[in-house]
C-alpha cells in the first residue's frame, strides 16, 4: 500500500499511456512480479488468494499497473511455472521474478480471441529438426511491445497425419522476423498498458523453445488463461471498491 500510494500516479500513467520504468523496477524489488513463483527461484511462494489480494490493492489505485502485473505474472510467467522444463525455468524465471525481464502471452489474432482453438499462426519444422519457422500475426497482446520473452501459440503439423495442432513457443524480440506492428494500441481505458500488434515473418525459433508437449499448446493456453482470468477479476474488484466511496460522495 505504501509503495502504491507513493509511486503510482494513475492520472499521469493514463495521460502519457506508459508505466514508468522506475515503477516496474520498484514492483520487482518488492517481489510483486514473482509473487507465486517458488522461493528457490527468488519468488515469494504466495497462494493465489494472497496474490489476488495484492492485485486488488494495485487495482484500487491504478488499473493499468494492475493489468500490467497480471499479464506479466498470471499469463506470461505462469506458463513457465506450469509447463517449463528445468532448463527453461532456470534460464528465464529469476529475471522475470525480479522484474529485470518482462513476459507476455501471445494468443489473440485477427481471427482468434476467445476461440483459442482457431489460431492461424503457423510453425513449420525445419528438415533437420533444429528449429521451426513461424509465420502469422497477433493482436491485443498486453506487454507485447515491452516483453523480453513471449509465449506464442502456433499451429504445428501432426506427425503422420494431414492436420495441425497448437504448440506453445518461447519467442524473443531479437529473433529475425519478429516485428512490432503497433506498439501501443489506442484505448479508452487502461491506457498505460502496452497493448501491441505483432507479426512473425518467417521467424526461426529453436526447437528447444517449445513450451510443454508438442501439439498440446491449447492445454497450455487454457490452463494459463484460467488462472489469469481469476486474478484479472481481482484487479477489477479493487477498482470497483475504490469507485464505490467516490460514487457515494459524489
Task: Go through each PLM region and give its residues.
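A structural signal for short hydrophobic beta-strand segments in well-ordered beta-sheet cores
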Residues: 121-124
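Glycine-rich beta->alpha junctions and the first turn(s) of the following alpha-helix
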Residues: 180-250
